[in-house]
Amino acid sequence: NWDGMTDIASAIQIQKGLGATNLVAGQLGGTINIVSGAATAERSFSYKQELGSDSFLKTTFTANTGLLDNGVALSGLVAKKTWNGYVDGTWSDAYSYYFSAHKTFGNGKHTLDVNVLGAPQQHGQRDEDQIYTVEDWKSFSSSDYSSSDDFRRASPHRYGSGWGELTEEQYDYLNDNYIGHRGSTDWAHDVLFGGIMHTKQVGDMYLINTRTNYYHKPVWSLNWKWNVDEQSSLSTTFYGSKGRGGGTGPMNTRDTFMGDDGEDDYYKYFNPAEMSDGSGTIDWTQVIANN
């Protein structure tokens, strides 16, 4: 949820140890206070582009009206971040947003602030119990991998696991039939990503992940401050947060079609045409044959 807040915050305060807070209970491990709000920002508009390794790209727009003569101030941030991932198959797509509205009224004695923020994201997960590709397993004898010290240990290098390569035709088929992207999660995932992405184009490759992680838990708040007199004030805050997140994939029953006998029918999940012989750690042709 806090991705992008550094671009809109006017100050970030870090307190170590025991700290006081207006919410629920004191913080024993420390407190991070992000100071933001439309009223404190100067009038401005900014566009920022960030580039990094492995095709990292982040685009950020921010806008602030400043405090207007009528006591109104508005601030907003929208950002998009994509990354192919350091490890194979660990692509990432993410958005972040922040909107704030401020109003001063009652001869300056009352202020009202409304804030909404969130950061929907999805990324391909890595299965840490595999380090070999399909081609590796085909080349091994049973004695090779059963005696290996690296067997069933996480890969120390960039070879990922839990993904397989599709042909462009298969990729298009899955997405055209709304199978590569599963919906009914929440509005942000449906609108921004078209649902949960099980298929993904990364560079020139078309991938399918056994696990896709997704998360979105927006936070909204309403703050009212009343300056009673020079010595006293009253602050009232209403806030809430509701979201959805987790990990899912084509091997979960929630995202597979049921066969005629009541069992999961993975064959219906994929294009019945020939599967790809491309690299990856899952032999999808054999998965289909076994199911």
Where are these regions (language model features)?
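Non-catalytic regulatory/gating segments with a bias toward low-complexity or hydrophobic composition
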Residues: A11-Q13, I32-I34, T236
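Short sequence motifs at beta-strands and strand-loop junctions characteristic
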Residues: V24, G52-S55, G89-D93, G203-D204, ...
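Transmembrane beta-barrel wall of Gram-negative outer-membrane proteins
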Residues: S44, L51-T82, V87-H181, W187, ...
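Flexible glycine-rich, low-complexity coil/linker segments exposed to the extracellular/periplasmic environment
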Residues: S141-M205, D261-N291
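Outer-membrane beta-barrel transmembrane strands
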Residues: K200, D204-G249, N291
